[in-house]
Amino acid sequence: MADILDSRPHAFSIKLWPPSLPTRKALIERITNNFSSKTIFTEKYGSLTKDQATENAKRIEDIAFSTANQQFEREPDGDGGSAVQLYAKECSKLILEVLKKGPVAKVAARELISEDSVSPRETFFDISKGKRAFIEAEEAEELLKPLKEPGNAYTKICFSNRSFGLGAARVAEPILASLKDQLKEVDLSDFVAGRPELEALEVMNIFSDALQGSILSSLNLSDNALGEKGVRAFGALLKSLSSLEELYLMNDGISKEAAQAVSELIPSTENLRVLHFHNNMTGDEGALAIAEVVKRSPLLENFRCSSTRVGSKGGIALSEALEHCTHMEKLDLRDNMFGTEAGVSLSKTLSSFKHMTELYLSYLNLEDEGAIAIVNALKESASPIEVLEMAGNDITVEAASAIAACVAAKQDLNKLNLSENELKDEGCVQIANCIEEGHSKLQYIDMSTNYIRRAGARALAHVVVKKEAFKLLNIDGNIISEEGIEELKEIFKKSPELLGALDENDPDGEEDDDDEEDEEDEENEGNGNGELESKLKNLEVNQED
C-alpha cells in the first residue's frame, strides 16, 4: 500500500488575494457594526451614528485594500497571504483611530480619520500641465524628484507635453527602471516633439529599455511621429508587455511598415481591451497588419481606426477581424474610404455584437446600400446602441425607412448624427416619426446639411421639444424658408437652447434634383395640412419584433 500511495504533500497554488467583492462588502458591514453597536470599545470611546459608521467603514476598507493591493503587486508570484495580513492590520488600526476620536457631529464625519495617517498616497505623477517645452537634464533632476522618494506609491505616470532630450532621458532612465515593478499606466505621448530624428529615436530606446519588463496595463505612445523606426525603437518594451490592456498609437505616422512592426512586436494581446490608431497613414496594407492584431484580441472592447486612409480591401479585412471581438462596445472607423462593399462586410460583423453602445461610421462612402445593410444588422442585433453616427455617407431617402426602423428599435439611443447626407424632408419626417414614442434618453440629433425644408424641420422639432432629456437639435445648413425658421423659433420658444444655430441655413437654396417641392407651395401649407406633409405623416416604419 505504501508503494501505491504517495504520502508526499502535493503543491497547491491557492491565491488568497484579492478578496471577492462580497467579502469586501461583508467586511464593511462588520466595521459598521463595530462603530455603531454596543462593544467594549464603544462603551469606552462612544459609538457613532449609523451614517457616520457606514461612511467611515467604507473609507477604512478602501484605504486598507489599496495599501494591501500595493503590497501584493510588489510580490505577484506570492499567494497573497502577506497582503491579507496587511489588509486586516490596516483595518484594525484605522478602526481604533476612529473610535478614539469619539462620537462627533455628523457635519464633521469626514474628518474622523486623521488625514495624515490614512489618506491614500498619491498614485498619479503628471508633468504634462503647463506650457509645451523642452526638458533637459537639470530640469529633469528637479522635476522627477518625487519619483525617487523611497516607498512612493506611483502607479501611473504622464510625461506628455514635455520634449525629452538625451540628457533628460538619461536622468529618467534609472528612475523608471526602479519603478517598473509598480507602474501600471505610462503615458509617453508627445514626449520628443521638435527633436532631431536620431536624438528622438535614441530617447525612445532609453525609455524602452528602462521600462522593459514592466507589468503595464496601459501604454500611450501617441503624437510622436513614430513611423516604423519609432515603433521598433520601442521594440524591447512592446515585446515584454504580457498584460497590456490599453494601447494608444494615434497621430503617429503609422504607415504600412509601421503597422506591420506593431503586429510583429506585440506578441501578447489576449488582455487587450482598448486599441486606438486614429489619424495615421496606415492604408489598406497597413490595415491588414492591424487586422491581425485585432484577430488576436478577443477581449477588445474599444477599437478606433479613424482617419487612417483605409479603403475597401483594408475595410473588409478589419470587418472580418472584428468578428473575433464579441465584447466590442465602442467602434470608431470614421473618415476612411471603405465604400459599399466594406460596409456590407461590416454589417455581417455588427449583427453578432451584443454589447455595442457607440458606433461611429461617418465619412466612409457607404452610400445607400452600405448604410441599409448596416442599420438592418443593428436593428436585429442585441446591442444597446447609445451613439450612432453615419454623417457624410451619401445616404438618400431610399435608405430612410431602414434607418428609421433601426432607430425605432434602439430605445437607449442618446445621440444620432446623420448630417451631410441627402435625406430631405421625407427622410427627416420618417426619423421624426420613429422617435415620437419612447426614446426617453435621447439628447442630441444632428440632421444638418440634408436638403431639409420647412416640413421636415417642423416635424422633427415638434417631436424633440417634448422629450425631457433632450439637449440639442442641429438642423443648420439646410434650405428652410424664412417662415419655417420663424415657426421653429416659436416651437422652441420656451426652450430656445434646444435649437442649434441656423447661420448656414439657405432659405433660397434648392435641392440638387428634379423632385424638389416648389418653395411657394411649401409656404402655403399653413398649419401643416399640405399634401407632402400629409403623405409623410402616414408613412409607416416596418419594425420586426
UniProtKB/Swiss-Prot annotation:
Each LRR repeat, start to end: 213-236, 241-264, 269-296, 325-348, 353-380, 382-405, 410-433, 439-462, 467-494
Family the entry assigns: Belongs to the RNA1 family.
Annotated region (WPP), positions in chain: 1-116
Domains as described in the record: The WPP domain is required for the nuclear envelope localization.
Signal peptide (residue range): none
Gene Ontology biological process terms from the UniProt entry: nucleocytoplasmic transport
Function: GTPase activator for the nuclear Ras-related regulatory protein Ran, converting it to the putatively inactive GDP-bound state.
Subcellular location: Cytoplasm; Nucleus membrane; Cytoplasm, Cytoskeleton, Spindle; Cytoplasm, Cytoskeleton, Phragmoplast
Listed GO MF terms: GTPase activator activity
The protein's name in its UniProt record: RAN GTPase-activating protein 2
Disordered as annotated region, ranges: 496-545
GO cellular component: endoplasmic reticulum; nuclear envelope; nuclear membrane; phragmoplast; plant-type vacuole; plastid; spindle
The entry's keywords: Cytoplasm, Cytoskeleton, GTPase activation, Leucine-rich repeat, Membrane, Nucleus, Repeat
Biased composition (Acidic residues): 503-525
Pfam families in alphabetical order: LRR_6 (PF13516), WPP (PF13943)
Gene that this sequence comes from: RANGAP2
Assembly notes: Homodimer. Interacts with WIP1 and WIP2 through its WPP domain. Component of Ran complexes at least composed of WIT1 or WIT2, RANGAP1 or RANGAP2, and WIP1 or WIP2 or WIP3. Interacts with WIT1.
Membrane topology term: Peripheral membrane protein
